[in-house]
Amino acid sequence: FPDLILGWAQERDLNPLLVTALVRQESRFQPNIKSVVGAVGLMQVMPETGEWISTQLGQDSYSLTQPADNVKFGTWYLDFTHREYSNNSLFAVASYNAGPGAVSRWIEEKKFTNADEFVDKIPYPETKGYVESVFGGYWNYLRSYDPAVRARVDAL
């Protein structure tokens, strides 16, 4: 699904390697997977979230089991979470998993001063592991596919 991910990531001004890392964590690239809580497809979009996104996009007809719709909706939501948190990918990814209300509450209550502190103090174990996994995958993709990052790593 690289062309699909790249196309929607570029359309939404998201880093395609971050989106790829998120898809890997969410579904292991299995387009028909469904979670025990009901999330669907490559980007594990919840049906209720999909309904809300469809109204935001003005798209009445869609199927979250179809990779094209799922990635379109999932990247829209990831872009939404980025806009909610001033383009902070760490907060956006945590919000993608835990919901924007939870992340806003954590930020307000904890007054985080750096990214490591935020990750260490995420109160939901699932979300903490999710953020660590997505960003671990993202870092590996950056090292493998981003020439600037690869050059800096090789220079160490």
Feature map (PLM): residue ranges:
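Catalytic glycan-binding domains that act on GlcNAc-containing polysaccharides
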Residues: 1-156
